[in-house]
UniProtKB/Swiss-Prot annotation:
Region of interest: Disordered: 197-222
Biased composition (Polar residues): 197-210
Superkingdom as given in the UniProt entry: Eukaryota
Name of this protein: Uncharacterized protein K11H3.2
Length: 240
């Protein structure tokens, strides 16, 4: 069942008129009654009955008898009302956001915030908590902490004197650098300074001069054998 646009507009206006009349009647009853009349359950019941009766009269005039017909007739009207309410809510929220942004962008907000801070940012509770967390993570012994604060490590500077790098001897040269027991592995005809390795002796032993033997001593006799021989001679003299 489709209705003409004129009939829809008439139904809309009649519905609005009925609602306004019900609100005016309720307000007049509230003014004439005591201050606690709004909480009166009887008055609330009468107000609901008026709205229900006005809605039923409107539905009867429109010829609506089923739920589907009601949705077809009043569905678009209800959706328009909801869309308008949503647009109003969105507009109000947008205005509130814009006001908050304007307050934050104004220079007075920065001055107020700086006046509220009596202490520097380094002494704020957040910074103190952060430093305490880092101190818990990096635990140092008292010896290490004392040594790190007591002195600094000496800085090494580059030496001003430049030492000449030793150049390697080429293979073509006949003279080879002298190394220990080099002549055992390499024969150098022109280099006469290289000799075969000898048994190593200390300088003190080479410079030590053996004393001349005493009378009655053999040249190869050492001190222990000499003492032993002297004791044997003493015992032989005592016996005789």
């Amino acid at each position: 069942m489709e209705l003409s646009p004129n009939l829809k507009s008439n139904l809309n206006s009649e519905m609005n008129d009925l609602v306004q009349q019900a609100e005016e009647w309720a307000q007049s009853q509230h003014r004439s009654a005591s201050p606690g009349a709004l909480k009166d359950p009887k008055l609330c019941a009468i107000y609901k009955m008026i709205l229900q009766n006005s809605a039923l009269l409107l539905i009867e005039k429109s010829g609506v008898k089923t739920v589907e017909e009601f949705q077809k007739v009043f569905g678009p009207i209800i959706e328009e009302q909801k869309n308008k309410e949503d647009e109003i809510i969105e507009f109000e929220e947008f205005e509130e956001i814009e006001k908050a942004r304007a307050e934050l962008a104004s220079p007075t907000s920065f001055t107020k915030y700086s006046m509220m801070l009596d202490e520097p940012l380094s002494a704020s509770p957040f910074n103190r908590r952060r430093t305490s967390l880092f101190s818990d993570l990096h635990v140092l012994s008292p010896i290490a902490s004392a040594s790190s604060e007591s002195f600094e490590k000496p800085k090494r500077f580059a030496s001003s004197t430049q030492h000449a790098k030793k150049s390697f001897v080429t293979v073509e040269s006949t003279r080879t650098p002298w190394r220990r027991s080099n002549s055992m592995y390499l024969e150098d005809v022109l280099n006469r300074t290289i000799n075969t390795p000898l048994k190593s002796h200390s300088a003190s032993r080479l410079n030590h001069l053996t004393p001349s033997p005493r009378p009655g001593e053999t040249p190869l006799e050492n001190r222990a054998s000499r003492l032993r021989r002297m004791k044997i001679e003493e015992k032989m003299n005592e016996n005789f």
